[in-house]
């Protein structure tokens, strides 16, 4: 079937754009971007057309332009220009722009790094009743990103997201009620939350529901089933409450947000269960659990082998972080040759599973916090880290023997220079098989959930280490999910010319 976009008359759109039609400029920009990437004449014209409309305060053009610039790191001043246009849209209280600008403050791209500014932007977006952004805000509050850690406030924001049907929030709350993080421990409420999360197929929710089933009493099980059903019924009836209040999906602005917030709070309070009240004063006991399964507890890297240099870090990711990364990447899984143009020619010959790359537009506070943790473990700046990717191995899938350092032909002109260190972390470990094997060292590492491996692709003098040849053995039973990245010798977020000058 032909792409219907090709039926548009490019020349007519150009004429309309030149006469100041902002909608035409945006449509033309979209079509040109589909036809050519960075470095093409189509890309250059698309940027020009979008800048024209953005300069006329066209919100869609400003946001699209910012999204494009934020992903083209080789373009001079791209980050600063992206931040400028995100800020222009954020001043209109646009939730996506607020979230993306918050991300730039987290990374220090285009603006000075400032976690407090990031938190402020993401909170403004979350207050507009967006469950995903409420989960992002809760995570930041829980981890003290831009503030002092506040597990109680984090629990309240997760509950607000749950009140709107977020399965991610339900999973997070299951963990919190299980261990007592910002709320009193309550096995029945925890099991009810995992039941709600499992209803939306949120990763690992069924596993945790099964764990709770083994330790709860018959009365707690009955309480959990009843509470889960009441929560589901309440969420299903929320749209009717919005309709009764005269709120439609198209409503926006501060007035609509106030109305929606009032309806959500009133409707949730009708459950009349203090254990899950949005008001922390009504929730009673406040647990002070500080670690697993809600908060990651990685220790110092432990030596695995010297040749090649491989270090292991148990408990690198929390249960929530692992499930979140799987949920984020699962809908985008594709064969290796499809998910990354840069790696396709190299990777498709070695890897038989599927993968997803977490590009800038997919990154959130969880991903950025993981990147920071990786940077600390590798003792290299976060700006040297490749965008994270996720690999999924099913039955018999393998990653054949390969090295991760860039060979001379691939290193020439590579943005960021040599890949000094490879990082992998098990999101899920198979029941059998799937070990990471260092062939020249005749050493294999069996995976376990949350285990991270750092292996050095280069010797201390910077030369490639041929001992780093490694592979993944076939998965025999279960699935293997890996979070993966590489840390380069130089920043990946500098224009190409500037990066070359630095060398």
Regions found by a protein language model. Give the residues of each.
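N-terminal leader/linker segments that initiate helical-solenoid repeat arrays
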Residues: 1-30
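Structural signature of tandem alpha-helical TPR/SEL1-like repeats
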Residues: 2-11, 38-49, 74-85, 112-121, ...
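Short helix-capping/linker turns of helical repeat alpha-solenoids
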Residues: 19-21, 35-36, 55-59, 71-73, ...
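Hydrophobic face of amphipathic alpha-helices that form TPR/SEL1-like repeat modules
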Residues: 27-35, 64-71, 100-107, 111, ...
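Ankyrin-repeat and related helical/solenoid repeat scaffolds used for protein-protein interactions
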Residues: 148-152, 156-208
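Fe(II)/2-oxoglutarate oxygenase catalytic core
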Residues: 195, 199, 206-453, 458-503
């Amino acid at each position: 079937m032909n792409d219907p976009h090709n039926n548009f008359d490019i020349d007519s759109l150009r004429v309309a754009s030149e006469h100041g039609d902002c909608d035409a400029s945006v449509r033309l920009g979209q079509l040109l971007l589909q036809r050519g990437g960075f470095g093409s004449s189509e890309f250059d014209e698309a940027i020009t057309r979008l800048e024209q409309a953005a300069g006329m305060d066209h919100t869609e053009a400003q946001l699209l332009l910012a999204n494009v610039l934020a992903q083209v790191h080789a373009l001079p001043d791209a980050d600063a220009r992206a931040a400028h246009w995100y800020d222009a849209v954020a001043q209109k209280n646009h939730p996506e722009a607020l979230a993306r600008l918050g991300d730039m403050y987290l990374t220090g791209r285009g603006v000075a790094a400032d976690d407090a500014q990031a938190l402020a932007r993401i909170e403004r977006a979350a207050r507009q009743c967006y469950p995903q952004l409420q989960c992002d805000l809760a995570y930041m509050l829980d981890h003290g990103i831009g503030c002092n850690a506040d597990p109680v406030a984090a629990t309240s924001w997760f509950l607000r997201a749950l009140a709107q049907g977020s399965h991610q929030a339900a999973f997070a709350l299951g963990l919190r009620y299980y261990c007592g993080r910002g709320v009193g421990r309550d096995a029945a409420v925890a099991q009810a939350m995992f039941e709600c999360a499992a209803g939306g197929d949120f990763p690992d929710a069924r596993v945790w529901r099964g764990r709770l089933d083994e330790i709860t009493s018959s009365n707690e099980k009955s309480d959990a089933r009843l509470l889960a059903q009441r929560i589901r019924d309440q969420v299903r009836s929320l749209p009717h409450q919005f309709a009764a209040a005269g709120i439609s999906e198209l409503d926006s602005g501060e007035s609509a947000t106030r109305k929606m917030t009032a309806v959500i709070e009133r409707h949730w309070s009708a459950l009349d269960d203090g254990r899950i009240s949005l008001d922390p004063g009504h929730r009673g006991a406040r647990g002070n659990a500080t670690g697993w399964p809600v908060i990651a507890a990685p220790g110092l890297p432990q030596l695995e082998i010297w040749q090649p240099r491989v270090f292991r870090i148990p408990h690198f990711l929390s249960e929530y972080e692992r499930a979140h990364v799987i949920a984020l990447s699962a809908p985008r899984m594709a064969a290796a040759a499809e998910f990354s143009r840069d790696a396709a020619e190299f990777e498709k010959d070695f890897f038989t599973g599927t993968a997803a790359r977490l590009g800038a537009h997919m990154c959130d506070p969880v991903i950025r916090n993981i990147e920071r943790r990786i940077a600390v473990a590798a003792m290299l700046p976060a700006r040297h880290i490749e965008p994270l990717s996720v690999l999924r191995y099913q039955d018999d899938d393998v990653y054949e023997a390969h090295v991760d350092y860039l060979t001379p032909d691939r290193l020439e002109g590579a943005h960021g220079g040599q890949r000094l260190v490879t990082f992998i972390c098990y999101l899920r470990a198979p029941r059998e098989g799937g070990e990471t094997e260092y062939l020249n060292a005749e050493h294999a590492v069996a995976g376990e959930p949350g285990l991270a491996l750092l292996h050095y692709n280069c010797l201390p003098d910077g030369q490639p280490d041929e001992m780093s040849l490694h592979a993944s053995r076939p998965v025999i039973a279960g699935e293997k999910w890996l979070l993966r990245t590489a840390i380069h010798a130089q920043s990946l977020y500098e224009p190409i010319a500037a990066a070359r000058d630095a060398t």
